[in-house]
């Protein structure tokens, strides 16, 4: 049986994700972000609810990306996720993209020219952000063009880079429905951005989100729930440069900006520059919120849930892979578990996110 990996956030899970799962082949293993997202924000709903939605709509196994994989720039996000999926035996990686191109060719380009491509990055001006530098790199070495508004396409290039030398087949699937950033409600396949924008429109949500009750009936989280915590952390921290990726310049800008900022958007707009993108600033603010220091990654793979078919696959792996199905007295990943505790502080109705939780099991096989 073909084993297909998918890297996802499902923030939240919607019809476009269901389409991706239905289109992908074989047994589907999802490497999913935890309670904080790659672009630097809290998950709309917690990781367990998102896992359940995925498992009820085509996924066979959902594993958690550790905090220091989830909340990273595209290259590190892709590398960490693919490393985990390879341990779980995937043969191919399926992903949605705005531009279906020959990603397999890009893997070969990077395999042959990785040293030259990396060296080229170091020659570019420091005034450029890292995403801008990598886009120029791909344009020069592979002739790839960018519109600047295609985040899934950019992630696809990071997947190609991370897949070099791993013998993985990349399977791009054309993104259907609304564009990534679209807030338009007039689409059967509405974007996650539109869903987050219109959570109070039950008719829209019920048509856009499979198992919509799981979304509607659980706490909806955003930066608003954590901004006061963040402000406290910034104002009371003696040395912000001890936080991951915070240099002297950023520490000074953040300390100054927090005194006049009333919300996260104002703070990000004030701190961001051409060099420090808004996404990077948001990630750094997450690092400050959870007091993240030097990154370490766990050896074990945390299983969030599985179907009967997924369980059979995991049984084949458990003797040779460090699979974690319950976090008890021994920690799985200290940083992820600390981040979970802070996420839980945002709302009194969010249940325990780590200790004692066992995987969600969907025993009934899907009919499709």
UniProtKB/Swiss-Prot annotation:
InterPro entries reported for this sequence: Rossmann-like_a/b/a_fold, tRNA(Met)_cyd_acetate_ligase
EC number: 6.3.4.-
Any GO MF annotation of the entry: ligase activity, forming carbon-nitrogen bonds
Keyword set includes ATP-binding: yes
One Pfam family linked to the record: HIGH_NTase1
Reactions that this protein is recorded to catalyse: cytidine(34) in elongator tRNA(Met) + acetate + ATP = N(4)-acetylcytidine(34) in elongator tRNA(Met) + AMP + diphosphate
Location within or outside the cell: Cytoplasm
Signal peptide, first to last residue: none
GO annotation, cellular component aspect: cytoplasm
Main location: cytoplasm
GO biological process: tRNA modification
Residue sites binding ATP per the record: 7-20, 96, 152, 175
Enzyme class, broadest EC rank: ligase
The entry's keywords: ATP-binding, Cytoplasm, Ligase, Nucleotide-binding, RNA-binding, tRNA processing, tRNA-binding
Cited HAMAP family: TmcAL (MF_01539)
Family of this protein: Belongs to the TmcAL family.
Role: Catalyzes the formation of N(4)-acetylcytidine (ac(4)C) at the wobble position of elongator tRNA(Met), using acetate and ATP as substrates. First activates an acetate ion to form acetyladenylate (Ac-AMP) and then transfers the acetyl group to tRNA to form ac(4)C34.
Name of this protein: tRNA(Met) cytidine acetate ligase
Organism field: Streptococcus pyogenes serotype M4 (strain MGAS10750)
Taxonomic lineage: Bacteria, Bacillati, Bacillota, Bacilli, Lactobacillales
């Amino acid at each position: 049986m073909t084993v297909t990996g998918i890297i996802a956030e499902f923030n939240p899970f919607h019809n476009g994700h269901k389409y991706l799962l239905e289109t992908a082949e074989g047994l589907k293993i999802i490497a999913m972000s935890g309670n904080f997202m790659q672009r630097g924000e809290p998950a709309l709903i917690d990781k367990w609810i998102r896992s359940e939605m995925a498992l009820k709509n085509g996924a066979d196994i959902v594993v958690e990306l550790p905090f220091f994989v989830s909340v990273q720039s595209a290259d590190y996000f892709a590398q960490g996720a693919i490393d985990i999926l390879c341990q779980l035996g995937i043969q191919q990686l399926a992903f949605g993209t705005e531009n279906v191109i020959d990603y397999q060719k890009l893997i070969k380009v990077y395999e042959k020219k990785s040293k030259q491509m990396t060296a080229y990055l170091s020659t570019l001006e420091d005034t450029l952000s890292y995403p801008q530098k990598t886009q120029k790199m791909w344009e020069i070495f592979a002739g790839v063009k960018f519109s600047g508004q295609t985040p899934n396409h950019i992630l696809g290039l990071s997947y190609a880079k991370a897949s070099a030398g791993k013998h993985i087949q990349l399977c791009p699937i054309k993104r259907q429905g609304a564009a990534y950033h679209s807030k338009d409600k007039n689409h059967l396949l509405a974007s996650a951005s539109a869903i987050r924008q219109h959570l109070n429109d039950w008719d829209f949500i019920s048509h856009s989100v499979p198992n919509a009750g799981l979304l509607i009936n659980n706490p909806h989280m955003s930066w608003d729930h954590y901004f006061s915590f963040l402000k406290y952390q910034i104002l009371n921290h003696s040395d912000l440069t001890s936080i991951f990726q915070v240099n002297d310049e950023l520490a000074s800008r953040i300390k100054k900006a927090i005194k006049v900022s009333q919300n996260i958007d104002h703070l990000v707009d004030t701190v961001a520059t051409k060099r420090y993108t808004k996404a990077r600033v948001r990630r750094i603010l997450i690092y400050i919120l959870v007091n993240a220091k030097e990154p370490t990654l766990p050896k074990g793979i945390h299983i969030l849930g599985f179907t009967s078919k997924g369980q059979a696959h995991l049984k084949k792996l458990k003797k040779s892979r460090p699979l974690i199905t319950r976090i008890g007295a021994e920690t799985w990943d200290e940083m992820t578990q600390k981040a979970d505790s802070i996420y839980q502080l945002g709302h009194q109705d969010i249940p325990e996110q780590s200790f004692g939780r066992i995987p969600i099991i969907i025993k009934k096989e899907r009919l499709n």
